[in-house]
Amino acid sequence: MAKPTTIKIRLNSSAGTGHFYVTKKNARTMTEKMVVRKYDPVARKHVEYKEGKIK
């Protein structure tokens, strides 16, 4: 079988709360690490989420 183009990634909160989102991205077109501004319910504000590996 062929290698899948989309991979699952974990977006870790930069606020240090331990909250994370799991999403997917196209590994061929987005080669750099993903950084997204999303809502952190623990910190109760919008913060940057940085890409990390799923363990």
Curated annotation (Swiss-Prot):
InterPro entries: Ribosomal_bL33, Ribosomal_bL33_CS, Ribosomal_bL33_sf, Ribosomal_zn-bd. It comes from the Bacteria. Gene3D superfamilies: Ribosomal protein L33. Coiled coil: none annotated. Keywords: Ribonucleoprotein, Ribosomal protein. PROSITE patterns: RIBOSOMAL_L33. One of its GO terms (cellular component) is cytosolic large ribosomal subunit. GO terms for molecular function: structural constituent of ribosome. One of its GO terms (biological process) is translation. Pfam families: Ribosomal_L33 (PF00471). HAMAP family: Ribosomal_bL33 (MF_00294). Belongs to the bacterial ribosomal protein bL33 family. This is Large ribosomal subunit protein bL33. It comes from Jannaschia sp. (strain CCS1).
